[in-house]
């Protein structure tokens, strides 16, 4: 099970931007391959994604430096190590980098190797990746949080909030939940078409129509849920990603950045009032990044106000980092953490963040990025950690479907042991 060869290469992601792919080959000839996702809206404390900066090549977004770090720096250091020593390998790469944000080697280089090693090890043992990562107590299939309307940085629509998601909580299995989501997605397409609105899809496969604002988006989703034959608030709940850091400046939540002149400018208290109003009026049970990553006081107030009846997910706030999560736990900010492997940059650190969250009663949501590949590792991570929730886009684009289809396979493999995740989730007040 010793590592014999590590090869990094530059491939393209779902947005046509370069990203890193890594092959790890063991002495036995068994291989693991992983590719790395990339975000559009990024938290300022995320691990560094190393880009070349050469404007004459892919507009500066090339990843040849990161690939070179895989092939010339990381590979010689890891060859000969056991692929089964995931923690040892990840720690060796962190020591080799030596920076807090992985700025020297690049989180994209380190993560590619980290995930490829795990896949090679699982293949060597001839067990599924979710079983290798999570052990025998892995049987919870996640509730999908499907981003069916895009706003903010993910579209050109005049809506400040970045994502409007459906959560098929009333399903009895992942397979049924996926079907419900697909039916609502197609019903929404008709709702939008009937209004003469665009049904082109954004980065994550959701629609990005020229709606009039947040309430218009929510009402359109309600209409689609009903048109698909489901009951909002019972069969299907709604989740939002406000991505508030994107329009927070000098203590003000400035909606005009995305909504133009009709957009409001809200103080932290007014932002909290507005979010509370929305969950009172709509079947919303999950809000991500409702406050800015730098507004810890606002986060604390929001959690005190609505944390007992709504999942409050920290994405930019926590960046999958145990240091920021520990601060949030101590201050009473949020009650859930979004898990993005490339925010922190190694499998070991990702699992550490999930473990800390669960230990302190926080829920976890395993998540994709807006720039994805056909790699479905996050589906296995969601099951491996009994996360109970996954965010991996809408019901279109094969880079998103790859994850959903992998979850269908896992559920089939688990058979009667499979539990659909929402039953396991208790929102912490």
Curated annotation (Swiss-Prot):
Predominant location: cytoplasm
Annotated active site: 204, 340
Pfam families registered for this protein in UniProt: Enolase_C (PF00113), Enolase_N (PF03952)
UniProt enzyme class: lyase
InterPro entries in alphabetical order: Enolase, Enolase-like_C_sf, Enolase-like_N, Enolase_C, Enolase_CS, Enolase_N
UniProt keyword annotation of Transcription regulation present: no
Identification of the protein by name: Enolase
Organism per entry: Bacteroides fragilis (strain ATCC 25285 / DSM 2151 / CCUG 4856 / JCM 11019 / LMG 10263 / NCTC 9343 / Onslow / VPI 2553 / EN-2)
């Amino acid at each position: 099970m010793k590592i014999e060869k590590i090869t990094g290469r530059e491939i393209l992601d779902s947005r046509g931007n370069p990203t890193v792919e890594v092959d790890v080959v063991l002495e036995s000839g068994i291989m693991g391959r992983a590719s790395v996702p990339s975000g559009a809206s990024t938290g300022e404390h995320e691990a560094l994604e190393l880009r070349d900066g050469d404007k004459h090549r892919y507009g500066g977004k090339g990843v040849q430096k990161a690939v070179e770090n895989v092939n010339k720096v990381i590979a010689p250091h890891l060859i000969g190590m056991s692929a089964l020593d995931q923690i040892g390998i990840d720690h060796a790469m962190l020591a080799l980098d030596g920076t807090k944000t992985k700025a020297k080697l690049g989180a994209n280089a380190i993560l590619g190797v980290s995930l490829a090693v795990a896949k090679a090890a699982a293949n060597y043992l001839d067990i599924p990746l979710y079983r290798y990562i999570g052990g025998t107590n892995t049987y919870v299939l996640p509730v999908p949080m499907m981003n069916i309307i895009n706003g903010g940085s993910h579209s050109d629509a005049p809506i400040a909030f970045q994502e409007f998601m459906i959560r098929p909580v009333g399903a009895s299995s992942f397979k049924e939940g996926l079907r419900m989501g697909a039916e609502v997605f197609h019903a929404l397409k008709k709702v939008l078409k009937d209004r003469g609105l665009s049904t082109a899809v954004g980065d994550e496969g959701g629609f990005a129509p020229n709606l009039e604002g947040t309430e218009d988006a929510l009402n359109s989703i309600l209409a689609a849920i009903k048109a698909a034959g489901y009951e909002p608030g019972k069969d299907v709940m709604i989740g939002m990603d406000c991505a508030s850091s994107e329009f927070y400046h000098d203590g003000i939540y400035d909606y005009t950045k995305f909504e133009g002149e009709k957009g409001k400018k809200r103080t932290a208290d007014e932002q909290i009032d507005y979010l509370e109003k929305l969950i009172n009026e709509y079947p919303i049970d999950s809000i991500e990044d409702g406050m800015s990553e730098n507004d810890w006081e606002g986060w604390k107030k929001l959690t005190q106000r609505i944390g007992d009846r709504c999942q409050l997910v920290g994405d930019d706030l926590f960046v999958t980092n145990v240091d920021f999560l520990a601060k949030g736990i101590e201050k009473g900010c949020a009650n859930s953490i979004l898990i993005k492997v490339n925010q922190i940059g190694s499998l070991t650190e990702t699992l550490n963040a999930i473990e800390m969250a669960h230990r302190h009663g926080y829920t976890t949501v395993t998540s994709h990025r807006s720039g994805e590949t056909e790699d479905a590792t996050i589906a296995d991570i969601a099951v491996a950690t009994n996360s109970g929730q996954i965010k991996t886009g809408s019901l279109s684009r094969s880079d998103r479907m790859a994850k959903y289809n992998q979850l269908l396979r896992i559920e089939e493999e688990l058979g009667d042991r499979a539990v659909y995740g929402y039953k396991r989730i208790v929102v912490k007040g």
